[in-house]
Amino acid sequence: MHGLLLAAAGLLSLPLHVIAHPQPSTNLAGRGVDLDAYRMADRSSYMNSDDMKLKQPGIASLSGGNYVDTATEVVKRMMPGMTFRMVDDHYVGESGISHVYFRQTMHGMDIDNSDFNVNIGKDGKVLSFGHSFYTGPAPDKAPVEKRDFSDPMKAFHGACKALSLPINADKATVQTMNEHEVMFMGTSGAMSDPQGKLCYMAKEDGTLALTWRVETDMGDNWLLSYVDAKETEKVHNVVDYVSHATYQVYRRALSPDPTEGKRESIENPWNLKTSPFTWISDGKTNYTTTRGNNAIAQANFDGGEDYLNNHRPNNKNLKFEYPYAPNMSPKSYIDASVTQLFYSANMVHDLYYMLGFTEKAGNFQVNNHGQGGKGNDFVILNAQDGSGTNNANFATPPDGKPGRMRVYIWTKAKPARDSSFEAGTVIHEYTHGLSNRLTGGPANAGCLNGMESGGMGEGWGDFFATAIRLKPNDNRNANYVHGEWVNNSPKGNRMYPYSTSLQTNPLVYTSCNKYNEVHAIGTVWGSMLYEVLWNLIDKHGKNDGPTPVFENGVPKDGKYLAMKLVMDGMAIQPCKPTFVQARDAIIDADMNLTKGSNRCEIWKAFAKRGLGVGAKYDPKNRTGNKGLPKDCQ
C-alpha cells in the first residue's frame, strides 16, 4: 500500500475539551419530550473481591475447568431456581479477566433489564460478580399461552405518540422475524426499519411488566421504548443509545484545539499492531479517501442518514493536505475538517486497543480478522453535521452495528468553530462507545442509561480526554477546563475545572444529591478519577509519549495505568452501576492486574471526594464518607 500523508492537528495531545452537550439537555431532539423522566433505575448489586471472600467463600474458591462453566455455576448458586440464558458475548480480556454475561428469563422470554455478570480473574478464581436479577413474584402462566398482550403495531403507535416521534406508519405492516420479535415495514421518518420485541421488564416497584420493546433510530436519538403490552399508551422506560455530547492535522498527542498546536503533515500515522490493515483499508478494499476498517468520515451538511454518498476528501496519491484557519468559514475548510476527524478517531481507536478495547471486547471495526467479536461496525463520523449546533453526540448500538458520531458547528464565536478540531470533543464522544460496549458486555449497549450510571458515562469521557491532554510539565496542581475553545469561554462547559484542589473544585459524592442531570453528575465522577490519575502518576511517573509502555501487561507509568484500570473497571462492573460499584470495580481491576499494589492510592483518591469505605448509594440521599480501609490508614 502506498504511504499516506495526512495534514493532522494531533490527537493525543489535543487538550481535550469538551463534553458533549454544552447546554445539558435530554429533550428528545426538538420534540420537547424529557427522556430523563423515562430513565431506568440503577438497581444493580455488585460483590467485590474483598466482600466475596468474607460473605461468599464458597463462590470465591470456585476455580478450575472452563471459565464459562465456573461463571454459570456462580449464577446457579446465587440465584437457585431461576431461569436464565448466557449471552453470546463472553470473552477473556487483555488483562486476563474472563467476562461472562447472563440474561434472566421468564416463561422463555427475556427480562430485558435483569442481567448477571461474572468476572473470573487470571488466576482462574472468581474475582467478582454483579447482577440486577428480578426476585419478585412470577406470573403463573406464559403470556404467549394466554395471548394476553396487544398487537405489536398498537405498541409501535403508542411509542410514537407518547414520545412524539415523527414517524409515518399509515401504511406500515408487521413482519415476524422470529418468536417474540417483529419488524415494522413501510414506515418513513426513521433511519432504519423500526423493530419490536416482546419481553418482560422489572419495574422499580418490584413487579414485572410485560412490554413491547420498540426500537427506533431517529438519528439524534436511538431509542428502545418499553411499551406496556396491554396498555399501549403507557411507556414504562426508554433507553437511548445516543450519548449527547499523511494527514494535515493538529497532532500533538491529539492537540486539544487550534490554539495549542500547529498543523503538520504526518506520514502513515497508524500502528500496524492495532490497525493491521492501516486506516485506509478494511483488508479487502484499499481506499483513497477517509474510509477504512475503523472509521468512515464525511461531511453531513443536511444532517441526513445517507452517509455513504456524502462528500469526503479523495486523493489517489493519499495526500490528505487541505487548508484550514480558524478565521475561515466552516464549509470552506470541510476537507480539512473531515481529515482531522478521521485522524483523531483512528488515533483513539489505536490507543484504546492497546489498553484493552479489542475486537472480542466489542470495539468498532469492519473486519475483525478472526480476533473475536462481531465486525461490520466501524464508526460513522459526520463532520459539520447539520442536524444541530453547539454539540456532539455518539450512538452506541450493540456489537456488530456501526457506531455513529455527529460533530457540530459551534456558534459561540465568529466565525463559527468546528469541533472536529477540538480533540477533546472527539475523545469524549468516542469514549461513550467504549464505556457502553464494555459495561454489561458488547451485546448490551443499554447499561449506562440510569441517572448515576449515565453520569459516569459523561465523566469517563471527560477523564480520558483530560488524561490524554496532559502536558509534559504538568503536575498535580494542573487544572483543566473542558470546552473552552468551542465554547469561546475560559470557563468551558463544566461547573468547575478538573483539579486536585478542593478549593478550585469542591465537588464530592454528596454533591450528586443536588443534581438530576447526567453532565453535572459526570463532573463529580470525572473529578474523582482525576484524583486517581494524579495519585498514580505521583507513584509511577508520567509517560508523555502518545502510547503506553507495558511490562508484563501493566503500563509502566501512572497516566496510562490509570486509564487501563478505569477501562478494566468498566468491563468488571455490573450493568447500570453506581459510583460505589464502579469504584469497587476499579479496585478489583487493580487487584487482578497488579495484585492490589495500588489499592491505597486508589482508595485515598476516592475517599478525598467522599467515596470512602462508608459511602452509600441512595438516588435521593447519598451518604458521603472519607474513611479508608484499615490497611490504608
Curated annotation (Swiss-Prot):
- List, in alphabetical order, the Gene Ontology terms for molecular function in this entry: metalloendopeptidase activity; zinc ion binding
Keyword list, A-Z: Glycoprotein, Hydrolase, Metal-binding, Metalloprotease, Protease, Secreted, Signal, Virulence, Zinc, Zymogen
Glycoprotein listed as a keyword = yes
Q: Which organism is it from?
A: Arthroderma benhamiae
Instruction: Describe its function.
Output: Secreted metalloproteinase probably acting as a virulence factor.
Required co-factor?
Zn(2+)
List the GO terms this entry assigns under cellular component, sorted alphabetically.
Answer: extracellular region
**In its UniProt entry, what is this protein called?**
Extracellular metalloproteinase 5
Query: Which positions carry the signal peptide feature in this UniProt record?
Result: 1-21
Specify whether Hydrolase is a keyword of the entry: yes
Q: What family is it from?
A: Belongs to the peptidase M36 family.
Q: In the record's cofactor note, how is the cofactor described as bound?
A: Binds 1 zinc ion per subunit.
Q: Where in the cell is it found?
A: Secreted
Where is the catalytic site? E429
| UniProt binding sites for Zn(2+) | H428, H432
What highest taxon heads this organism's lineage?
Answer: Eukaryota
Q: Which residues are glycosylated?
A: N286, N592, N621
Q: Name one Pfam family in it.
A: Peptidase_M36
